[in-house]
């Protein structure tokens, strides 16, 4: 396969490497992901994360395995194992559905490579179109709040919500970005803060619990988040804490936007209640660990509830910013995300 490089993925000498997102920002460390078990482990441990990036990494690995001579049955088994790696992120399923079609072809090694590379290029283009559509909604002098990480680390391109923010800043419309630390794994504090710093976008890091106070003081002009899955009725599954922000924004009459590619749409999922929510290990809440070290602050044996995602009802969302443009609440209510409109 040809050499390929994005912010978080690299293909070199027919091997897949991922940027270890658990090591950032203290270390920039690339890890091999050249077999299914290894990539699944990287996904489970969030060394590779972000709904678009997970789907792309799985697709690239399948293509590389085919280049190494794995037969169709072995590739099908690999595909199903990868498909189960992150149940909430629908981009993974959508990408692998396309790879499955390529696998059915007579020339499947070449077809898988072509499809994987096509998915990467499409994601770059989708991100650019999302940024263009979303930046038009950002008013001059805006102070924006974002949650988790939705930039180039999570995609092959400029990102989704963070791509919007970055472009709006280049257009001179963003004066400050409030970055939720995003407990329990601190994707905002570790990753979004790092990306915004690299891009030269002014930001201030806040604890998640500070968002309400900022909104009450009139310090937030809009909230921008990404999505791991969008249901047919417009409900959105995203990083835990997103729903809280949507409720707060609604109360304070602040626009709340979701930015995502159409690959995040699940037109056959009727509503948020049907979205599977991944439950994660207690250790993520009882303490913290990373390249910066590890500490446990809760009592040993403390009972923990740790869902990775929550669901924001469509009624709290001001607009869904897709690569096809901005979708309004009225359009969603009229069936814009329904199966027969796909």
Curated annotation (Swiss-Prot):
The active site is at 228 (proton donor). SUPFAM superfamilies: NagB/RpiA/CoA transferase-like (SSF100950). Keywords: Amino-acid biosynthesis, Isomerase, Methionine biosynthesis. Pathway: Amino-acid biosynthesis; L-methionine biosynthesis via salvage pathway; L-methionine from S-methyl-5-thio-alpha-D-ribose 1-phosphate: step 1/6. It comes from the Bacteria. This is Methylthioribose-1-phosphate isomerase. GO terms for biological process: L-methionine salvage from methylthioadenosine. One of its GO terms (molecular function) is S-methyl-5-thioribose-1-phosphate isomerase activity. NCBIfam families: eIF-2B_rel, PRK05720.1, salvage_mtnA. HAMAP family: Salvage_MtnA (MF_01678). It catalyses: 5-(methylsulfanyl)-alpha-D-ribose 1-phosphate = 5-(methylsulfanyl)-D-ribulose 1-phosphate. Pfam families: IF-2B (PF01008). InterPro entries: IF-2B-related, IF-M1Pi, IF_2B-like_C, Initiation_fac_2B_a/b/d, M1Pi_N, NagB/RpiA_transferase-like. Its EC number is 5.3.1.23. It comes from Klebsiella pneumoniae subsp. pneumoniae (strain ATCC 700721 / MGH 78578).
